Amino acid sequence: MGNNVVVLGTQWGDEGKGKIVDLLTEDAKYVVRYQGGHNAGHTLVIDGEKTVLHLIPSGILRDNVKCVIGNGVVLSPEALLKEMKPLEERGIPVRERLFISEACPLILPYHVAMDQAREIARGKKAIGTTGRGIGPAYEDKVARRGLRVGDLFDMEAFAEKLKEVMEYHNFQLVNFYKAEPVSYEAVLEEAKGYAELLTSMVIDVTDELDAARKRGDKIMFEGAQGTLLDIDHGTYPYVTSSNTTAGGVAAGSGFGPRHIGYILGIAKAYCTRVGAGPFPTELYDGLEKQDPVGKHLGTVGHEFGATTGRLRRTGWFDAVAMRRAIQINSVSGFCLTKLDVLDGLEELKICTGYKMEDGSVLEVSPMAAEAFEKATPIYETMPGWSENTFGAKSLDALPQAALNYIKRIEELTGVPVDIISTGPDRNETIIKVHPFEA
């Protein structure tokens, strides 16, 4: 059972999943993406060299790891090919090790146009999407009008389907959003090129993963974004368009849920959020909220989105929201990242409850964004530490105050912290329990 591990974010994304996936894939044969698209940014630092991946699983930097993009991922062929190029220029074999489900919905130029037109139309009520066509592509999938990777291999049928769906989208773009239409001929010509370039990588992902499981190969499933951005369980409508939770693994890859052995939840030692939406423990947003501790977290933590480059909002660790993430994902253990960012703070706060307008106190976060926005955090204060934890590789190297902070998080959430990250490099990590050995 321990052969198959899920790594996912338990906050609002940007928790540091890429580094941990890269670290743990030393023991894996497969790394699988099961949801999202190129709106996710995973940053890896290996021997000081920085790599940012958006679509390709983080295991691509490990020579013997096969990387899989499951059917739950919305695939932009343009973005994928752009991402492959610099990796191949560095001598990393991508085509031989990257496999794509034929059932992946395609992101095409009209999805991007629709995404951006909608955000402009929303004005101050904008959700804060990346503008990369993710939501509209998922919409087409659910409406059963979407084009999929497998459609590229019958170009005559593809052209007919494309014409129909583009008439639908262009009508909305022109008549409702007062935007420019997207050229059918240009999109079709692009698609012909994609078919030729992607063919060799397309496989039956479900069959491949089942065969790997039967051989005893270790499989890692790499989540994108975070639990609180899940389309069903997040702070709706300020969410992404896919299931970012553990339940998304089976649906987004075709891998049977009974075969998942360990679920690793990734959480920062504090909280961040990009874009709009409620954030009860928020300290700093660069605009209205200018708390110096929040600014410290953003500056020292280099809190800028890997995909958007946008400044992340920062705040204290939220055990209330974490309890909800644990319920949804049945988290086996945590990896606490960016512990070193807290170095030098005299005191730390952990949110232990939400006080609501009616005077009630919630110990588990509510579902709706409206309720989130009315929550006042109840804090527990703990002493900080002045010692340097950056790059620590053992518990003995951590000050007692840091150990106390970690222990308190375990007590408040009821889940053990099995891994602690103390820097961006893969070796700046303390592993108490290895997920593949749990």
UniProtKB/Swiss-Prot annotation:
Designated name of the protein: Adenylosuccinate synthetase
KW Ubl conjugation (keyword) present: no
Pfam families: Adenylsucc_synt
Organism: Vibrio parahaemolyticus serotype O3:K6 (strain RIMD 2210633)
Record gene name: purA
GO BP term, example: 'de novo' AMP biosynthetic process
Cofactor or coenzyme needed: Mg(2+)
Family affiliation: Belongs to the adenylosuccinate synthetase family.
Keywords, in A-Z order: Cytoplasm, GTP-binding, Ligase, Magnesium, Metal-binding, Nucleotide-binding, Purine biosynthesis
HAMAP family, per database record: Adenylosucc_synth
